[in-house]
């Protein structure tokens, strides 16, 4: 189950996508559908079929974003978070082999297209929550447990 949390930046990104789809792309595609429909036979009209399909995709995404944004809770930075890993933190970790990772713990709807973001619901994020610099986080993986040490914690203020 995904936790309905999002950073302010993530919420603004979703809002911009919704605005773009609803105010710019959808009206443009609607015009193309109308134009293609006016050409006659729709069964063999590739422009009509493609744009009709695109319109359905846009409408599906708009419905998803609208419903999703109603249920999301924006989590802003709080000074009480300083020094510990919480939602929205940039965390640098290192394992026993010296491998280092740096990522931000964010909501499910923010991770797509970003390799440096992980979901708050991931095993790694759950293991890191409330840890401080120097703490050991034991992460359950499909092949057993992995040990990671917290090297740094930063917040976007």
Curated annotation (Swiss-Prot):
- Keyword annotations of the record: DNA-binding, Transcription, Transcription regulation
Offer one example of a GO biological process linked to this entry. Answer: regulation of DNA-templated transcription elongation
**Domain of life of the native organism:** Bacteria
Q: Name one Pfam family in it.
A: GreA_GreB
Q: Where are the transmembrane segments?
A: none
| InterPro entries attached to this UniProt entry | GreA/GreB_C_sf, TF_GreA/GreB_CS, Tscrpt_elong_fac_GreA/B, Tscrpt_elong_fac_GreA/B_C, Tscrpt_elong_fac_GreA/B_fam, Tscrpt_elong_fac_GreA/B_N, Tscrpt_elong_fac_GreA/B_N_sf, Tscrpt_elong_fac_GreB
Recorded GO molecular functions are: DNA binding; RNA polymerase binding
User: What PROSITE patterns does the record point to?
Assistant: GREAB_1, GREAB_2
Q: Which family does it belong to?
A: Belongs to the GreA/GreB family. GreB subfamily.
Query: So what does this one do?
Result: Necessary for efficient RNA polymerase transcription elongation past template-encoded arresting sites. The arresting sites in DNA have the property of trapping a certain fraction of elongating RNA polymerases that pass through, resulting in locked ternary complexes. Cleavage of the nascent transcript by cleavage factors such as GreA or GreB allows the resumption of elongation from the new 3'terminus. GreB releases sequences of up to 9 nucleotides in length.
Q: PANTHER family from the entry?
A: TRANSCRIPTION ELONGATION FACTOR GREA, TRANSCRIPTION ELONGATION FACTOR GREB
Q: Do you know which NCBIfam families this protein is assigned to?
A: greB, PRK01885.1
UniProt-listed HAMAP family: GreA_GreB, GreB
Listed name of the protein:
Transcription elongation factor GreB
Q: What is the native source organism of this protein?
A: Salmonella typhimurium (strain LT2 / SGSC1412 / ATCC 700720)
């Amino acid at each position: 189950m995904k936790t309905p949390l999002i950073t302010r930046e993530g919420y603004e990104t979703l809002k911009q996508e919704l605005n773009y789809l609803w105010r710019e792309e959808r009206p443009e595609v609607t015009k193309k559908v109308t134009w293609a429909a006016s050409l006659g036979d729709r069964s063999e009209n590739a422009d009509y079929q493609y744009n009709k399909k695109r319109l359905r995709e846009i409408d599906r995404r708009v419905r998803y974003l609208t419903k999703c944004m109603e249920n999301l809770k924006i989590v802003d930075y709080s000074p009480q978070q300083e020094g510990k890993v919480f939602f929205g933190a940039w965390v640098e970790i290192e394992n026993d082999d010296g491998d280092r990772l740096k990522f931000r713990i964010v909501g499910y709807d923010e991770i797509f297209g970003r390799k440096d973001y992980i979901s708050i619901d991931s095993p790694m994020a759950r293991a890191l929550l409330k840890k401080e610099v120097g703490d050991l986080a034991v992460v359950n993986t499909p092949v057993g447990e992995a040990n990671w040490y917290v090297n740094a914690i930063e917040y976007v203020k």
